[in-house]
Amino acid sequence: MPELKTVGLFFITAIAEIIGCYLPYLWLREGKTIWLLIPAAISLALFAWLLTLHPAAAGRVYAAYGGVYIFTAILWLWLVDGIRPTVWDFVGVFVALLGMAIIMFSPRPA
């Protein structure tokens, strides 16, 4: 799977997971309607399905996905929560994405 497609799929997967967790947060912490649990459940089911689309071993996919999830969560912090990330947030994202790239794209024996 080409690298750009892999990272793009990870990004879409992260959005599905974050939405699936953010909607119950809105219900529990912000007093929003319980009906948010329906799209949350759909989003989490989509998240699980998207993880199955990668041809790599599941454990490797889950480990590498974490790096893109961290990037997406910090982006969410900035765009949705309105909190500007710190320099340390950006450093952490860089380290996580570097780890993701090493895990997913390093050469493997055939």
UniProtKB/Swiss-Prot annotation:
Q: What family is it from?
A: Belongs to the UPF0060 family.
Q: What is its main location?
A: membrane
In terms of domain of life, where is this protein from? Bacteria
Q: Where are the transmembrane segments?
A: 7-27, 33-53, 63-83, 85-105
Keywords for this protein: Cell inner membrane, Cell membrane, Membrane, Transmembrane, Transmembrane helix
One Gene Ontology CC term in the entry: plasma membrane
How this chain sits in the membrane, per its record, is: Multi-pass membrane protein
Q: Lineage of the native species?
A: Bacteria, Pseudomonadati, Pseudomonadota, Gammaproteobacteria, Vibrionales
**Signal peptide segment:** none
Q: Where in the cell is it found?
A: Cell inner membrane
* Protein name in the entry: UPF0060 membrane protein PBPRB0495
